């Protein structure tokens, strides 16, 4: 289930409207930068992702609210998308840190984050409400220095090999 671990599920028309409105509100407030992901190979919209909790004064952001339709999962599209977003974050915006969070039970998302070079930092215990109650969140990140040392090249190699 695509929305099983989502803090803001977008299943159903009303939930989808709420999801989009929250993303647009964050954009207006300059705390969130949502992106629609388009797959050029299939000429189809595949999903979305966003920078959020953008803190210019600390040169940090979080990257998440990522989801892809079933046909796009496991295709390498996420790695391509994350490469471009991380490149933009570190090389254009000059950020020092990009943080990722997920439900600590969401093994698929955690594996995807680790596969792009994220390092696990720890677990925030019962840190937020979800549609099914309190949840633990895993925190991972990529630092600017790590991006330039090896994460960028390793991720690019994975993309090329795919």
Show where each model-derived region lies.
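Conserved GNAT acetyl-CoA-binding A-motif
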Residues: 91-101
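Conserved beta-strand-loop-alpha-helix junction that forms the acyl-donor binding cleft
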Residues: 100-109
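Conserved catalytic-core motifs of GNAT/GCN5-like acyltransferases
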Residues: 101, 119-133
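Conserved acetyl-CoA-binding loop-helix of GNAT-fold acetyltransferases
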Residues: 74-88, 111
